[in-house]
Amino acid sequence: MMKKFPLISVLLPVYNCEKYIEEAISSVLNQTFSDFELIIIDDCSNDKTVSMIKRFTDSRIRFYQKEKNSGYTDSLNFGISIAQGNYIARMDGDDICLPERFAKQIEFLEKNPTIILCGTAIKFIGSLSGNLFYPETNEEIKISLFSFLPTFAHPTIMGKKEIFEKYNYNKIFEPAEDYELWTRLVQEGEVVNLNEILLEYRVHSSQVSVTKKNIQDLNSYKSRLKILQKLKIDSQYSKEEIINFLVNKNLPFCFDPYKTRVLF
């Protein structure tokens, strides 16, 4: 008998997530859509994350412990390389999937085969409250990539595995590896966001978007520069002039990463 592979492979890279990991995993396992595998990759956590993960006995979980701490992007690309599903879904160890997230995303993607990537709106939890709705259409998302407006919530995305296998995440741009990937994917096919909150996104002082915000911003600027170069838009300007323009344009927002982004 041929082995039946799951429709979705959920990638969950973790590092020192002991406070939230049980709730995050449970929210995935309790999805109304059940045809998935949950690939958890631990990046040498030194807290209780591993022992808490091992308490789960669900057969859909595939747990891997890296021998060396090599970073978030490396974990994601490893997960892509071993994924068995037709679709890749993302999840983080401090967030919560709402019960119908997978069902609604997979239904949309299956009905719209030209769409290669699908995100959703989010609800903030933790140290920030409110809801955030992202640009919905392919054209709106392309425009947003060149501003400081939010484009996707990384842990909400689901897309075709073949696209992730073709492109992978680029470690050079970590911790803005997701933003850089989006700039490549919009040139490959259509991307969208569902106008529905399907994930609770936790904001806390130890998350990467807070602890490494300056590096994240700089690498997002470099991603934009790469696209401008490809489009030959920057022929009369130096790299330094373009990066300075992008930084200065967005300077008012750098002191508060969520300024003007949250819709209550």
Pin down the residues of each PLM region.
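Glycine-rich, basic loop-to-helix element that forms the pyrophosphate-binding segment
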Residues: 66-83, 104
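Short loop->beta transition adjacent to catalytic acidic/histidine clusters or analogous donor-positioning motifs
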Residues: 5-8, 29-40, 48, 59-62
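Short aromatic/hydrophobic "clamp" motif used to bind/position activated sugar donors
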Residues: 88
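N-proximal low-complexity "stem/linker" segments adjacent to membrane-targeting elements
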Residues: 1-29
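Conserved donor NDP-sugar-binding/catalytic core segment of glycosyltransferases
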Residues: 100-132
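A conserved acidic beta->alpha catalytic loop
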Residues: 27, 42-51, 57, 68, ...
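Conserved nucleotide-sugar donor-binding catalytic segment
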Residues: 81, 120, 135-241
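Acidic helix N-cap motif at the loop->helix transition within catalytic regions
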Residues: 19-22, 47-55, 96, 100
